[in-house]
């Protein structure tokens, strides 16, 4: 009944709840003699932590990570690496009204049916609070990728759509992504998104989002055919993130609007090396990397914790209504950007250790 771990060689297990004393993870399979301290992990956690802008939850968590094991004198020992972050800003009183009610769109009902008990405070184990530890594991994964692949591998996540408003790809600027609260590559979309989120928040609602992850520098040949395809493993990793309802590679779903002529990635030779004339398949063919940029996207549904009253039932199977109080993201997709990067990084690191 447990499924709190992911990965084969690079494997990590997360633990902890939203309003518990702490959250943490144990990362196994990390080779020895890799430089690693808290300073290597903290910058990635700072990207994800809550309370950084008016467009995310106002819960204040410093998310200061502590390494408990698996390193000695600033280097990995080859043994399990234990990480911990202490929760600091729980407000469990906000959830008293939903103790016996199921929030529509949340895991409240399904956890109750499966386990016969649930931590109603902030969603407990099903809360996105857990994703901080995924980001920590992702930071370690990046160190492994750097150690295993000679080329510089760059993993870049960006928010490309909120609600009905999508970026203009012609405006894509990697340098702008870390300079705004949305991780947007398009400067022109910011004001539109700000207005949309404010409108949704004032109406007691929320918005969904799409995040794109790009990986440059991967060699051709990474991944295994059929049941261990690198794209299927990435899809599994991304689908495991809270509120994610869809994943695609390359043109993905929009491929249905193409033909075999327009969607195929033709090839030539340049400087005695293979050259692809397009990248409609997102850098993966047959589950194996082509050496092109790997491109994947995932869809995050609108936050289910909203102020607007909704119909639901309670633990006595009686009909009732619910209005969720507390501090919640009006668009949870914003903080999902570094989480998506981390899950792609952990998948690539696992494949590097398995097949390189």
Feature annotation, model-predicted:
Residues 18-21, 204-207, 211-319:
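Glycine-rich anion/phosphate-binding loop at the beta-strand->alpha-helix junction
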Residues 11-16, 119-130, 220-224, 279-284, ...:
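A short glycine/serine-rich beta->alpha loop
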Residues 11, 303-356:
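Internal helix-turn-beta structural module
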Residues 113-226:
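Glycine-rich, mobile lid/loop segments that gate access to catalytic sites or pores
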Residues 1-59:
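N-terminal, positively charged regions that mediate nucleic acid binding
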Residues 21-33, 129-153, 228-236, 292-294, ...:
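Alpha-helical support elements that line or immediately flank enzyme active sites
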Residues 45-104, 108:
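Glycine-rich, N-terminal phosphate-binding loop and its surrounding beta-alpha-beta segment
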Residues 99-125, 310-330:
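Short acidic, glycine/tyrosine-flanked loop/strand segments centered on an H-E-D-like triad
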